[in-house]
Amino acid sequence: MGSSSSSSLNNSPIRADSMVTPESQMTVNDNKNDNVSILSPSVKKSFESPRKSTSIPANNNLTPVKSRWSFSSSKKSFGSKDETFFDSQPWLQSDSDDDFHSVNGDFTPSLGNTPKSSFSDRPPRFHNLIFHEKKPSRGSSSPAPLPRRKKLGELFRDSIREEREESGSSSAISTPYLSGANSREFNDTAIEKEEKKKSNWHHHRCLPGFSSCGGSFMERRKKMSSETPVVAVK
């Protein structure tokens, strides 16, 4: 068995002495028939490990590329430091509109830095200035109500009554020695006459009198007809 294995090694095309190690670049065989073999750098690289061949040579001009799962990328994916800071602060959530009004430097809650009791205990100044009415003091008396304005008809009635009273007083003064029955009849007749005069006066005041206008118009027409000469027709 030993002789057969040695003979097979001698007959194989690749001989043990022609094997080249990575350190040696050139090997010279003892046999005269074999030529000198020079290995190129590419052949040398083929014998090296595959990890070294895939590695990128270091270059001073180029900055090294960071891996995909570096710390900076993971930091961006989970949010920056500022974002986490603002997210950690709870916002004040309130349904009432009083918390968000600010007049003359009143408190307006923004990020919950102040306690809730500072704006919940006292109402804001906005409502005190506008909506809350000023309470009257105890010593001040209530203002007197304004007098009601009279209508036009009421004013006419008052004037007629005043005139009647004045006329009655004047008639009583002018006839002091009349009896009771005669004085009453005289007063009634005087009042009726005055009412008729007032009614006529009101009618004349509201509507213009056409009698004067009509008379003047008829007179002018007669004058015109008299002045025009009569032309005889042949």
From Swiss-Prot:
Known tissue expression: Expressed in stems, rosette leaves and roots and weakly in inflorescences.
Biased composition regions of type Polar residues, renumbered to the chain: 21-40, 52-64, 105-120
InterPro entries: At3g27210-like
Highest taxon of source: Eukaryota
Compositional bias ranges of the Low complexity kind: 1-12, 66-77
Induction, per UniProt: Rapid but transient induction by wounding, salicylic acid treatment or pathogen infection.
Residue ranges, compositional bias (Basic and acidic residues): 152-167
Chain intervals for the UniProt region annotation (Disordered): 1-184
Subunit structure: Interacts with RLK902.
Name this protein carries in UniProt: Uncharacterized protein At3g27210
Species whose genome carries this gene: Arabidopsis thaliana (Mouse-ear cress)
